[in-house]
A protein has these predicted regions:
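Parallel beta-helix/beta-solenoid
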Residues: 20, 60-61
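Short, polar loop motifs at secondary-structure junctions
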Residues: 62, 103-104
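Glycine-centered low-complexity coil/loop motifs and glycine-rich tracts
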Residues: 1-16, 24-57, 66-101, 108-138
Length: 138
């Protein structure tokens, strides 16, 4: 954006993991926004905004996200202001996670941010905005 102050954090980008067999995630899949820059003293010390969370798409007939695994697409934190000029930067917006799988062969025991709505069940209706979206493979 315009104006004075520090730069915003980078966006989270996009990650797509797809297979025609089994996808097992036992580590971390991240598409998180970067931290905004801190303000500088003396002039124009507003902190930069955090980068927006990115997008993650997991596609597999059989999907396993094991306990201890993490799948996140969150916004970065805003930078710190430098007194007395400016304010702190705002946080970046939440990203999106989409899953296409066969619900009967899906196990989601890991941590998701944004959060799951209803485990491996197909996501429908209201109350799902800002959450993990799950659809059945055709």
């Amino acid at each position: 954006g315009g104006g004075h102050g520090m730069g915003g954090g980078g966006g989270g980008g996009a990650v797509r993991l797809a297979t025609t067999t089994t996808l097992t995630i036992s580590g971390r899949v991240l598409a998180n926004g970067g931290r905004g820059g801190d303000g500088t003293s003396g002039c124009c010390g507003a902190g930069g905004g955090g980068g927006s969370g990115g997008a993650i798409m997991l596609v597999a007939p059989t999907l396993r996200v094991v306990t201890g695994a993490t799948v996140t697409a969150i916004g970065g934190v805003g930078g710190v202001a430098s007194a007395p000029y400016g304010g702190a930067g705002g946080a970046g917006g939440v990203g999106r996670i989409a899953i296409q799988t066969t619900p009967s062969t899906c196990t989601l025991a890991g941590t998701f941010n944004p959060a799951l709505v209803d485990a491996c069940n197909v996501t429908t209706g209201a109350g799902t905005r800002g959450r993990v979206h799950i659809s059945a493979l055709p």
